[in-house]
């Protein structure tokens, strides 16, 4: 007699951990006082308080068309504060992230790319009234033709006060079949589009079955009228409206991504229409946030465009980040603070970030270990904090996952100081890499050698001719 054993393989959920996935907000209380460590944010008290004031004004809709510059050395949390602001604003307020190098493309001009990013950052909250049918299904009758013709049926639906019978067409029957609507289900039907939504199962049918699925939800039978008018709010960006009205394929261009350049006339017509909706009370503008990282990579034409775009009445809040000091403005020979023209700097509120202390680096590394589900001994954490203080925070963060692999190799679930030392010897940081280049630089091929060898090859080719 043979016994068959069935093995079960657990399918692990794919989870990607990003550089800022541990950040849930900017860590402020109701009085805009920053906590030392909260919502994944550590240190940078002054910068977070300033960001909190900006955040409060954005939420209240008081400011728009302002520019904020976050300036500070590398690895001081500029992008982290911006990501924290995005988390605090929520999904209803548009927050668009743009790297300055994304602007340069062969398919569209620089100003068009910036203008599309600006209009993605402005939301339009459109209100409309729709008529819905809401109630508990008493009976669904479907008559199918023997010859395969159109299906017909009747839907009996009730509330606590009344009961009504509706005639069903082919499309409505297909929608009910797709949602698997049965007698006893509480449903909602949008009359304008014919969309059927199953809200749950009525409490009166709770004893129909002995066993129920985990996703079964019981709700009360709706009260009052079966047909009701309901206000629905949709939030779309101005860019979405631009794309739908500018392309022949309409909304399909949103999914293909091939938006191309949009004519100014189309945008003017949309701005006029949105202004009419605002006056009629049908829509309201939601000024969002455009975050431009590595802003010093933009050239003088882009900065000139921002000078004009920020003065527009439909302009979002633009947050820029730069880690440059006094450097050359791209496209010119002039030097300026942060690589940004002085006339644009004059329009900005500047938030500065400072290097982290040893204790702050240690706290950030501890939060990242929790995020990556890694156990680390206190001595190893101290040593890694020292490395982060002497080299850079990013380098120390990268050593967490690699040292965890070394620990797993020796069958240990906890990272020890020896594991950190091992990966520190294997992977160079920026300072040690420069020292290595200075020591062994003569063995590398340099630009001068390439140019010399190229000239020699040209001379040989000319002699052969």
From Swiss-Prot:
Q: Where are the transmembrane segments?
A: none
Q: Where in the cell is it found?
A: Nucleus
Q: Which Gene3D superfamilies match?
A: 1.10.8.60, P-loop containing nucleotide triphosphate hydrolases, RuvB-like helicase, domain II
Q: What one GO molecular function would you report for this record?
A: ATP-dependent chromatin remodeler activity
Its UniProt entry gives the catalysed reaction(s) as:
ATP + H2O = ADP + phosphate + H(+)
Which Gene Ontology cellular component annotation is one that this UniProt entry carries? Answer: NuA4 histone acetyltransferase complex
* A biological process from GO: rRNA processing
Q: Which InterPro entries match?
A: AAA+_ATPase, P-loop_NTPase, RuvB-like, RuvB-like_C, RuvBL1/2_DNA/RNA_bd_dom, TIP49_P-loop
User: Which UniProt key words apply to this protein?
Assistant: Activator, ATP-binding, Chromatin regulator, DNA damage, DNA repair, Helicase, Hydrolase, Nucleotide-binding, Nucleus, rRNA processing, Transcription, Transcription regulation
Q: Where does ATP bind?
A: 72-79
Supply the name of the protein: RuvB-like helicase 2
């Amino acid at each position: 007699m043979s016994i068959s054993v069935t093995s079960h393989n657990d399918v692990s959920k794919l989870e990607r951990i990003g550089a800022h996935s541990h950040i849930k907000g900017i860590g402020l209380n109701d009085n805009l006082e920053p906590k030392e460590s909260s919502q994944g944010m550590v240190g940078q008290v002054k910068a977070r308080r300033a960001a909190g004031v900006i955040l409060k004004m954005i939420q209240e809709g008081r400011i728009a068309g302002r520019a904020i510059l976050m300036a500070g050395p590398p690895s001081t949390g500029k992008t982290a504060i911006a990501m924290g602001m995005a988390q605090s604003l929520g999904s209803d307020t548009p927050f668009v992230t743009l790297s300055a190098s994304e602007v340069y493309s062969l398919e569209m001009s620089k100003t068009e790319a910036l203008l599309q990013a600006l209009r993605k950052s402005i939301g339009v909250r459109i209100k409309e009234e729709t008529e819905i049918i809401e109630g508990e299904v008493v009976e669904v009758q479907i008559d199918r033709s023997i010859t395969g013709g159109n299906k017909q049926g009747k839907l009996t639906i009730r509330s606590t006060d009344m009961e009504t019978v509706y005639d069903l067409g082919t499309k409505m029957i297909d929608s009910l079949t797709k949602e698997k609507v049965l007698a006893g289900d509480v449903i909602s039907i949008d009359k304008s589009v014919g969309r059927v939504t199953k809200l749950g199962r009525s409490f009166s049918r709770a004893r129909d079955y002995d066993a129920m699925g985990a996703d079964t939800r019981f709700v009360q039978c709706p009260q009052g009228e079966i047909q009701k008018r309901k206000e629905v709010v949709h939030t779309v960006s101005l860019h979405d409206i631009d794309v739908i009205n500018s392309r022949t394929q309409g909304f399909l261009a949103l999914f293909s991504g091939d938006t191309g350049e949009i004519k100014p006339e189309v945008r003017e017509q949309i701005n006029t229409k949105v202004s009419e909706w605002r006056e009629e009370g049908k829509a309201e503008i939601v000024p969002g946030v455009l975050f431009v990282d590595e802003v010093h990579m933009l050239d003088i034409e882009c900065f000139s465009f921002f000078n004009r775009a920020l003065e527009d009445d439909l302009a979002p809040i633009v947050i820029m980040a730069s880690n440059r000091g006094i450097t050359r403005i791209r496209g010119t020979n002039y030097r300026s603070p942060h690589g940004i023209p002085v006339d644009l700097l004059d329009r900005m509120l500047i938030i500065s970030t400072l290097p982290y202390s040893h204790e702050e680096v240690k706290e950030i590394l501890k939060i990242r270990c929790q995020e990556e589900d890694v156990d680390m001994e206190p001595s190893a954490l101290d040593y890694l904090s020292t490395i982060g203080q002497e080299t850079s925070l990013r380098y120390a963060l990268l050593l967490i996952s690699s040292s965890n692999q070394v620990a797993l190799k020796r069958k240990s679930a906890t990272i020890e100081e020896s594991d950190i030392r091992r990966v520190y010897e294997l992977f160079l940081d920026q300072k040690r890499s420069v020292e290595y280049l200075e020591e062994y630089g003569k063995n590398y091929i340099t630009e001068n050698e390439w140019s010399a060898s190229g000239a020699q090859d040209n001379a040989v080719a000319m002699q052969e001719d």
